[in-house]
């Protein structure tokens, strides 16, 4: 009795994705497909989707970290568009990068114009020295 057909054959293993090879969470294959489909250039290099996925992942991680800090400052456990707006607008580089972007349900930054604030000299002398 011989083990027919069982010698030398290895079990078929699942292939690893390009994202896993690059150590990324963002889909390298999908980004590559979008680059080809979008007709941005005649040809797309093998490293271009990997690089773009890494850049997008870094930007998302940066924004989510700052938005998480904003949510924690407001004693909330869920990140809302308001927290993302506060995070982006309070960071100088992200604000410059996303200057033309409007966040839905983001609100506005809290800001009171200096002219509308009471003067400090009036606060000290105003209550003690009133002439009728």
From Swiss-Prot:
InterPro entries documented for this protein: Histone-fold, Histone_H2A, Histone_H2A/H2B/H3, Histone_H2A_C, Histone_H2A_CS
Subcellular location: Nucleus; Chromosome
GO molecular function, one term: structural constituent of chromatin
Keyword DNA-binding appears in the UniProt entry: yes
Pfam family, one: Histone
Bias (Basic residues): 1-13
Key words of the record: Chromosome, DNA-binding, Nucleosome core, Nucleus
Subcellular location, principal: nucleus
Annotated CDD domains: HFD_H2A
Keyword DNA-binding on entry: yes
GO cellular component entries: nucleosome; nucleus
Disulfide topology: none
Database matches in PANTHER family: HISTONE H2A (PTHR23430)
Subunit structure of this chain's protein: The nucleosome is a histone octamer containing two molecules each of H2A, H2B, H3 and H4 assembled in one H3-H4 heterotetramer and two H2A-H2B heterodimers. The octamer wraps approximately 147 bp of DNA.
Family membership noted in the UniProt record: Belongs to the histone H2A family.
Functional note: Core component of nucleosome. Nucleosomes wrap and compact DNA into chromatin, limiting DNA accessibility to the cellular machineries which require DNA as a template. Histones thereby play a central role in transcription regulation, DNA repair, DNA replication and chromosomal stability. DNA accessibility is regulated via a complex set of post-translational modifications of histones, also called histone code, and nucleosome remodeling.
Protein name listed in UniProt: Histone H2A
UniProt source species: Plasmodium falciparum
